[in-house]
Regions:
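C-terminal partner/receptor-binding element of secreted or periplasmic proteins
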Residues: 101-125
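Short, non-transmembrane alpha-helical segments in secretory-pathway proteins
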Residues: 25-58
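Bacterial N-terminal signal peptides that target proteins for export
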Residues: 2-11
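Exposed beta-strand-loop-beta-strand "reactive/processing" segments of non-cytosolic proteins
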Residues: 53-98
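General secretory precursor processing signal
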Residues: 21-23, 60, 83-84, 124
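Bacterial N-terminal signal peptides
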Residues: 11-20
Length: 125
């Protein structure tokens, strides 16, 4: 009986380790980070974005630290008929390099989720 119990514990432990490794998807480049952000913006229909064609009025500005990519999503007014010298920031994302997890400060996302937004970054997928 003890042998079976130990075997079950070992299988459970191994499964948990495998699950953690599968979920850990390192992000190695700015391009990978932007692709994750685009996928998330489309998935959550932020600013009415339903597909990549809807992103023509957006521009992505990227800062990199040792742990993460910080991506500002801005309105590209020149492409959309506005003042070419103005690109207001709409919202930002943080992409964790080690895990690939995302967080955003999008007010629209918080509102859709019914969260009383205080300006902080919220986890998003």
């Amino acid at each position: 009986m003890r042998k079976i119990f130990n075997k079950k514990i070992a299988i459970l432990f191994f499964s948990l380790i495998c699950a953690c490794l599968v979920n850990a998807a390192p992000v190695k480049s700015e391009n990978e980070a932007v692709k994750l952000v685009i996928k998330s913006v489309i998935k959550h229909n932020i600013y009415g974005v339903k597909n990549e064609n809807d992103l023509k009025c957006f521009r992505f500005y990227i800062d990199e630290t040792a742990e993460e990519f910080e991506i500002d999503v801005r309105s590209n007014n020149e492409k959309c008929g506005g003042d070419p010298n103005v690109e207001p920031r709409l919202f930002s994302y943080i992409v964790n390099k080690k895990t690939g997890k995302l967080a955003t400060d999008s007010f629209e996302y918080a509102k859709k989720k019914g969260i009383d937004w205080d300006g902080s970054y919220l986890p998003i997928d």
